[in-house]
């Protein structure tokens, strides 16, 4: 885990001077260069960091090896050693590719530190593992990604962690759900898959109000899954959130080649999160960190600018099609939460950036009819479309379509889906870099044949 731009571990003097020199450069430029002259790794003047290919590292002496192990001591209280540069011992403890990536991710989200993991779910699990214990309670928004829902409902009860589900846009319901044992307010925005927007500042204000009456040890934290937006479109830490989690597999990687996850948060969280990762696993391999570092993050801004423009055109087409009952995309004037979206979803140039994912529902009088039509449409696209691929994931350079009710959110029962606002006929569409006319052509073909 890296603590750039700030951190507890003392590195050499280059990062401090570099931070001062780069502060006047655009954030999009810093996605490419990150932290130049990083002390994490002297890679002999390569313009592009090479792929680190070793699982273990040669040590010059037992003394140096001992010092390295002290830095990764067994308790957080012991983990207070200061050094000028990392001592790499073993990939699970630290490795240069992922540490450089962590520096750059912290810059991208404008956070104090970042820790990468094998997947987004590994990052979510680690954050909860660090913040929560037996008897802790989570209050979560009632619609979440299906695997997060599964983690909260199937696994946390085994550890005596209670989860209360509530609509985070209902202020009174949220207040009623909070108890003295609540340690975490957890939500996504935009919400997967419904594209609902949660007011980040209001949730932060609720947490701060309660924390004013609590001791430090009983503090309640806020965490946002920012996967749909990516740091290009939204940076929740700027609104006062404690932690951001993201799946690197999605928009940040962008090419659908590598999995990863990240926690970005305050400086003090460095020690416990890295120690948790050391003991529980979930370390991001160098072979996955490297492509995200050299291809994914540097190209995020240019990819998303184009993909957002295409998403707007596709959303407008669907909104005007007679076969479609509902389209939810923050970039549409008809989107009921657009004022809030415009406040939160701003790119590095302070332009409204509503993302690359939309949600739509085919017309049907009953949930069953809409479900049937959605499955038919998606199945037609799976075999007949050139520009749209039936696949989970999102943020890819290729346009991806999926049916949440039977795929990503199938861990939630049909009855619960309806209660939580997930339409059985809802279709999630993640727009890629194809020409908008080609995507629309394939959608027209599917709508004409099936609906």
Question: Where do the language-model regions lie?
Answer:
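Short, flexible, solvent-exposed loop/turn segments with mixed acidic/basic and small polar residues
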Residues: 129-130, 154, 338-351, 415-422
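PLP-dependent enzyme catalytic core of the Aspartate aminotransferase-like
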Residues: 2-15, 112, 135, 153-154, ...
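Conserved PLP-enzyme active-site core in the AAT-like
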Residues: 5-23, 28, 35-42, 113-323, ...
């Amino acid at each position: 885990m890296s603590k750039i731009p700030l951190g507890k571990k003392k590195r050499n003097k280059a990062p401090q001077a570099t931070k001062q020199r780069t502060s006047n450069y655009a954030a999009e430029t810093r996605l490419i260069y990150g932290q130049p002259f990083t002390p994490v790794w002297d890679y002999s003047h390569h313009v592009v960091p090479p792929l680190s290919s070793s699982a273990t590292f040669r040590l010059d002496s037992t003394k140096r090896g001992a010092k390295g192990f002290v830095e990764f001591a067994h308790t957080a209280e012991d983990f207070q050693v200061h050094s000028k540069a990392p001592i790499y011992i073993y990939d699970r403890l630290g490795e240069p590719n992922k540490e450089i990536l962590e520096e750059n991710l912290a810059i991208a989200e404008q956070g104090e530190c970042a820790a990468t993991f094998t997947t987004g779910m590994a990052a979510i699990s680690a954050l909860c593992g660090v913040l929560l214990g037996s008897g802790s309670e989570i209050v979560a928004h009632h619609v979440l990604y299906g695997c997060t829902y599964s983690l909260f409902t199937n696994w946390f009860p085994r550890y005596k962690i209670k989860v209360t589900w509530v609509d985070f846009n209902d202020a009174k319901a949220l207040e009623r759900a909070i108890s003295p044992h609540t340690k975490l307010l957890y939500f996504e925005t935009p919400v997967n898959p419904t594209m609902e927007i949660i007011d980040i500042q209001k949730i932060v204000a609720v947490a701060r109000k309660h924390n004013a009456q609590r001791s430090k040890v009983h503090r309640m934290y806020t965490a946002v899954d920012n996967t749909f937006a990516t740091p290009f479109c939204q940076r929740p830490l700027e609104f006062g959130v404690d932690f951001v989690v993201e799946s690197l597999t999605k928009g940040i990687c962008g090419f659908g080649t590598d999995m990863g996850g990240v926690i970005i948060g305050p400086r003090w969280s460095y020690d416990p999160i890295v120690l948790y990762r050391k003991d529980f696993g979930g370390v991001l391999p160098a072979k996955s960190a490297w492509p995200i570092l050299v291809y994914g993050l540097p190209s995020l801004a240019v990819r998303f600018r184009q993909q957002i423009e295409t998403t707007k055109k596709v959303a407008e087409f669907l909104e005007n099609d007679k076969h479609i009952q509902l389209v939810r995309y923050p970039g549409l004037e008809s989107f009921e939460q657009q004022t809030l979206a415009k406040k939160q979803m701003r790119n590095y140039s302070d332009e409204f950036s509503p993302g690359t994912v939309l949600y739509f529902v085919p017309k049907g009088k009953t949930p069953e009819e809409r479900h049937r039509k959605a499955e038919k449409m998606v199945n037609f696209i799976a075999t007949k479309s050139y520009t749209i691929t039936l696949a989970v994931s999102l943020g890819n350079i290729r346009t991806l379509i999926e049916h949440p009710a039977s795929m990503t959110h199938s861990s939630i029962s049909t009855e619960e889906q309806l209660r939580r606002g997930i339409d059985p006929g809802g279709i999630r569409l993640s727009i890629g870099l194809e020409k908008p006319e080609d995507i629309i052509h394939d959608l027209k073909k599917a709508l004409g044949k099936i609906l």
